[in-house]
Structures are given as structure tokens and as C-alpha cells.
């Protein structure tokens, strides 16, 4: 990837990410108990977007992708693992207010710490060679599986919502939720794909690392 094109894409994405991140965190909502779950979901979404903004900022201002490939891969793997958890939690809790529990939160945090630690060990302690490549492949598979599992939970939650609305509400509401479910399929596939393409080194990274 050309550095100029890469920087332009980051420059275009950063303002949008920052705007929506702060908007989700700080915008006013009706002060009613019924909106509490919605507010928590929006705040989690805002935190996830600001976390991605911080990641993009490091790439944009310091060009870490072209200076230290291992550090860039580690930062992206760790960031996307955590963002998968945050985005999925924000979406699911809109449909299932009991989804967020202390046990689930601690499980995701512990998994994130283990994943990030193992990524650092593989990238900085293992010598370059077949073992490092196999280990990186295993971590990539872990990230893919984690993303797919979370995506499946989101899709199941939306399908459950469709059934509930079909049984209790008007047809137009059920159709809307069904459309939202289809949109969610594509959003999740796009998000997981972008995450993988971001941390996997391209030809520029490989040549930089070899130099």
C-alpha cells in the first residue's frame, strides 16, 4: 500500500471516528429509566470508536506500520480483539438487557490480556522463522473464531427479536428488524474483514521489515 494513500485514508477516517465516538459518549438522552440500557450501549459503542481512533492516530501521526511491523501488528491485534468484544456487547445489550454480566466482562478482559500477551511473546521473543509464522497463524485463527462467535451471538439476538416482534407487534416493525438483521450480517463481515486486513502485513510491511 502506498504510504500517501494509507495516510489519506486514515486522515479521512479519524475525524469521523472521533466525532461519533464523542457524540455517543456525550450527547444528551432522555433522563428516564427506560433509556438506561440504550445509554449504556451507546457509551460502550463510543468507547470502542475512540479506542479505534487512538489506534488510527498512532498509525497516522507516527507511521508505525512502515517503521516497526511487529509493533503495528501487535497494536492492531490487541485493539481489534477488544473492539470486537465492545461492539458486540453494545449491539446485543440493546436486545438483551441481561447480556452484560460481571462474569462475561471479566472473561473478555482475561481473554484480551492473554491474547495480547501471547501476541507480544510471538512477535518480540520468538525468532523469525517457521515457528513465528505458525504462531501468528494460530493467533489469527483465534481472532477470527472470536469474531465469528461474537457475530453469531449478535445475529441470534436479532433473529430472536424478529420472532418476538412478529408475534407481538405489527408487521412493519418486524420487517424493519429483519432488515436491520440483514444489515448487521454485512456490518459484522465487513468489520471482521477490515480487522484482519489491518493487522496482516502487506508487501510494503514485509519489505520494510526485511530492510
Map each language-model feature to its residues.
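Hydrophobic alpha-helical transmembrane segments
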Residues: 93-96, 123, 195-202
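Alpha-helical transmembrane segments of multi-pass integral membrane proteins
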Residues: 32-54, 108-109, 133-210
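Membrane-helix interface motif
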Residues: 121-126, 159-161
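Membrane-interface helix caps and helix-loop-helix hairpins in membrane proteins
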Residues: 67, 126-134
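N-terminal low-complexity or simple alpha-helical regulatory segments
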Residues: 1-121, 138
Amino acid at each position: 500500500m502506498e504510504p500517501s494513500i494509507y495516510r489519506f485514508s486514515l486522515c479521512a477516517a479519524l475525524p469521523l471516528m472521533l466525532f461519533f465516538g464523542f457524540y455517543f459518549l456525550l450527547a444528551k438522552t432522555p433522563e428516564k429509566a427506560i433509556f438506561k440500557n440504550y445509554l449504556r450501549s451507546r457509551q460502550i459503542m463510543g468507547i470502542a470508536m475512540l479506542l479505534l481512533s487512538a489506534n488510527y492516530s498512532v498509525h497516522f501521526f507516527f507511521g508505525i506500520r512502515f517503521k516497526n511491523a511487529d509493533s503495528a501488528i501487535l497494536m492492531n491485534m490487541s485493539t481489534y480483539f477488544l473492539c470486537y468484544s465492545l461492539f458486540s456487547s453494545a449491539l446485543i445489550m440493546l436486545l438483551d438487557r441481561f447480556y452484560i454480566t460481571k462474569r462475561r466482562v471479566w472473561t473478555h478482559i482475561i481473554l484480551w490480556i492473554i491474547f495480547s500477551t501471547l501476541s507480544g511473546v510471538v512477535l518480540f521473543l520468538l525468532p523469525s522463522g517457521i515457528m513465528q509464522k505458525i504462531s501468528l497463524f494460530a493467533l489469527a485463527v483465534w481472532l477470527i473464531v472470536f469474531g465469528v462467535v461474537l457475530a453469531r451471538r449478535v445475529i441470534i439476538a436479532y433473529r430472536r427479536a424478529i420472532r418476538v416482534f412478529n408475534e407481538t407487534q405489527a408487521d412493519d416493525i418486524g420487517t424493519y428488524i429483519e432488515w436491520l438483521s440483514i444489515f448487521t450480517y454485512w456490518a459484522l463481515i465487513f468489520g471482521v474483514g477490515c480487522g484482519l486486513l489491518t493487522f496482516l502485513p502487506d508487501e510494503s510491511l514485509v519489505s520494510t521489515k526485511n530492510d
